[in-house]
Regions:
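Glycine-rich phosphate/adenosyl-contacting loop at the front of the ribokinase-like
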Residues: 1-71, 248-249
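Gly/Ala-rich phosphate-binding loop of Rossmann-like dinucleotide-binding domains
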Residues: 62, 164, 268
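A glycine-rich helix N-cap at a beta->alpha junction
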Residues: 86-101
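Conserved phosphate-binding/catalytic region of the ribokinase-like
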Residues: 1-14, 23-26, 42, 207-310
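Conserved phosphate/ATP/ADP-binding segment of small-molecule kinases
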Residues: 157-241, 248
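Conserved phosphate-binding/catalytic loop of the ribokinase/pfkB sugar-kinase fold
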Residues: 97-99, 109-145, 150
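A short, aliphatic-rich alpha-helical micro-motif
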Residues: 8, 139-141, 184-186
Length: 310
């Protein structure tokens, strides 16, 4: 992987993207949203927790010993205040967070009690979209890495472009395919895709071949999370495949976000791509053994113990 950015910046990672209140509902048996007729399901357990892609990645980064700051949008309602308090309690700086005149992003998460797999229903108010004035080059220059997701893809592209211009490395959480996805890929140093995205972009089913096809548009490391199959990355011409760790999963919510926190940590340690993926996979696996997104973030010593066992 490429050399690290300057180490003398106030923060290791700055995040812009989703910070959510999650209403987690644990259901007995398999979740099926495409049932042919109306149905009723009893909820076994209900939790109200904090999450969101970028917010969870920042919480993970701090848990591993990094300095993190959130500069994304938060609602001006009680849910937004709760997310802000949660970030602060986990050691994430929120000085540059943008409090918008809108309700905070939220999600309803249905968790299959047997497998831990989840279905996420989410909403984000248009008033949470960031404008050009909200993205300050000075704030972006204060971090070694700027991490963005694609919930506000316009802001993500602007932030990534500005961050690269001031010498920061940009990592991403790309979960959807839109007309601007490839702009975000091009603006990023390390695009990290959800499992389905490379195939959706290229039309190639095999993940490794899909990443190779994307190599024509991006010269750097390309990474994709693969759920229960782990993760893969294309580093130069080398395809690095890293299997998942086998755990007893109770909730897979936030696993990809925790993976990205592990990836950022490994990169800043100067590790090889293979070692970085293995660490990130171990972190993601541990997060699946607990409910919630931020609530499932492991500590570095827990990850190291799992690595020793594995």
């Amino acid at each position: 992987m490429q050399p690290s950015p300057p180490a003398d910046r106030p923060f290791d990672v700055l995040g812009i993207g989703a910070a959510s209140i999650d209403f987690v509902h644990v259901l007995p048996g398999r979740i099926a949203l495409n049932v042919p007729s109306p149905t009723k399901r009893r909820i076994d357990r209900r939790l109200v927790l904090c999450g969101g892609q970028v917010a969870t990645t920042l919480a993970t980064s701090v848990s591993f010993g990094l300095r993190a700051t959130f500069a994304g949008a938060i609602g001006n309602d009680e849910n937004g205040a709760r997310v802000r308090r949660e970030l602060v309690s986990r050691g994430v700086d929120v000085t540059d967070a943008i409090v918008c005149d809108a309700p905070n992003q939220y999600a309803i998460i249905l968790v299959d009690e047997r497998s831990g797999e989840r279905t996420i229903l989410w909403d984000r108010h248009p008033g949470l979209a960031l404008g050009e004035r909200d993205l300050r080059p000075g704030a972006l220059a204060a971090a070694r890495i700027v991490h963005v997701d694609d919930v506000d893809v316009d802001a993500a592209i602007r932030a990534a472009t500005l961050a690269r211009a001031v010498g920061a490395v940009v990592t991403t959480d790309i979960d959807e395919v839109t007309g601007r996805t490839m702009e975000l890929v091009s603006a990023s140093t390390f695009p990290i895709f959800a499992e389905h995205v490379p195939s959706a972009i290229t039309g190639i089913d095999e993940p490794g071949d899909a990443l190779r096809a994307l190599r024509r548009t991006h010269p750097g490391v390309l990474c994709a999370t693969l759920g229960a199959r782990g993760a893969i990355a294309l580093d130069g011409s080398e395809l690095v495949q890293s299997p998942a760790f086998v755990v007893e999963a109770v909730d897979t919510t936030g696993a990809g976000d925790v993976f990205r926190g592990g990836f950022i940590y490994g990169y800043l340690q100067g590790w090889s791509t293979a070692r970085t993926l293995r660490f990130a996979n171990a972190a993601a696996a541990l997060s699946c053994t607990r409910f919630g997104a931020m609530a499932s973030v492991p500590f570095r010593d827990e990850v190291e113990r799992l690595l020793q066992l594995g």
